[in-house]
Amino acid sequence: LCSISFDPETRRFGHQVDTLYSSEQATVQITGAEHKSASFPRVSPDGKQLVFTLSEYGNFSIWHKDADLYRIDLDSGVMHRMDEVNSDDVESYHSWSSNSRWLVFSSRRIDGLYTRPYLVHIDENGKTGKPFVLPQEDPDFYSRFMFSYNIPEFVKGKVEAEVHTIADTARKPGNRIRMEK
């Protein structure tokens, strides 16, 4: 997992690449984190922490029971397994709140089948609270709802887009970027 600077005005990447996570580093810091694939790196909006998913292999960690969340303190470079957050089943995609104090993440901890959105508070020192499933008005909602929340995201306001508009946008080609040597 590497970091490289990017200038949005010129749309150019920098030249220096910094390694944030490598399997060799993980071997030294955390037993059991060696030789795994890192995916979904997300830097907190305050720039102090980075949370990512580690799994045995590949990029679709939502299908890997071993997938867990890890955190790197970006000031010290120290990596932490998020034991308070992880369960015996999948923890995968995640998103920060705008104030860097909440994380929403996908987990299959209830039944191992469907992915549910969990929230956890993270204080300014990186200490996490106890995760909880996103509350619903009906207490039986999750036992009857047969869909997965694979990619939970925080939003600041009402989403006012029609389904067909979102689908049309998703079908459009992405923006091209250019890398120079």
Model-derived regions, located:
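Sequence signature of WD/YWTD-type beta-propeller architectures
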Residues: 1-181
